[in-house]
Amino acid sequence: QMALQKLQFKPGIVRDTTDYTNEGGWFDCDKVRFRMGLPETIGGWAKFTNSTMLGTCRSLHVWSTLTGTNYVGAGTSKKFYIVDGSEPNDITPIRLTTTGTATFAAVDGSSTLTVTDPSNDVYLGDFVTFSGAVSLGGVITALVLNQEYEVTHVVDGNTYEISASVTANASDSGDGGASIVAVYQINIGLDTVVLGSGWGAGVWGRGTWSSAADVTVPGATLRLWSQDNFGEDLVFNVRGGAIYYWDASVGTSSRGVNITSLTNNSAPNIANQVLVSERDRHVIAFGCNPEFGSDGNPTTVQDPLVIRFSSQESATDWQTRPDNTAG
């Protein structure tokens, strides 16, 4: 009878070799950790919030205010949220507000509403909130119209479609009135893939020989966020887009705003990434527009090699002067 032998397994997962050559070791596992040389299952996950955030989340930042309130900044492919406790609050910045130019059109038997608003620049999946609209005459009431909608189809540069919660009838022949306010959030980004680029990009025969391919398609870039707290406030940026600022003192009912809209602001209008230097409190923008172009005049053209930073202790003062520390 063969004697029993105690098996001694080496801790850790090794996949640099085959499972055969990794004798006495572990080659494959899932949700396992090693403690004191022995394997054990990793504990489960607890649901952070029962509320749903729209889009694929790609950026999280946790910080506390001066009063001890804990916040989480969450950037997704469709929205930007501030999570207070366990409740996400939509603070997605606004890019355009129109007043008195939007109109609605309904078709009997359809829940699709056609919105005409000149030069709205919406992408498929963008979000717009209406107010001030009146009933179309039937079941498409003011209550139905005056809320947030996701764009379901873009007809052209002036017209797009949304889906109402009810089906229109023959009485819905109005246009919503002359006092409609349409508030457009910043354009969404992709959540999974990006378009191909490089050789062969674009349509066949476009442009002149050896000219650069134009692969900039609205909404066709992966939505990536960068964010950092400036004290108790939050600075955040869409890659290849504007820099935004959220003031914690105004609460989660207020949206983030373009940092260039703040008083006495000379910040970049476009950047690929932002962060705050923790020790000396400069806001730093990577891949932004330079302060001046080659002609010596102010420019808004992005340069991926340019790095700029605000004056110390200021998120808005970016102008290089002898009396500050911006650069």
Placement of each model-derived feature along the sequence:
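N-terminal beta-propeller domains
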Residues: 1-97, 186-214, 270-327
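Short consensus segments that form the blades of beta-propeller domains
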Residues: 51, 71, 138-143, 225-226, ...
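A fold-level detector for beta-propeller and closely related beta-sheet-rich head/sensor domains
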Residues: 73-75, 215, 237-241, 260-263
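An acidic- and aromatic-residue-enriched active-site/binding cleft used to recognize and process polar
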Residues: 76-77, 85-86, 133, 154, ...
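Hydrophobic or amphipathic alpha-helical targeting/insertion segments
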Residues: 90, 232-246, 251-254
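Small/polar beta-strand repeat architecture
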Residues: 90-224, 250-257, 263-266
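Active-site-adjacent structural elements in enzyme catalytic domains
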Residues: 229-230, 239, 250-251, 263-287
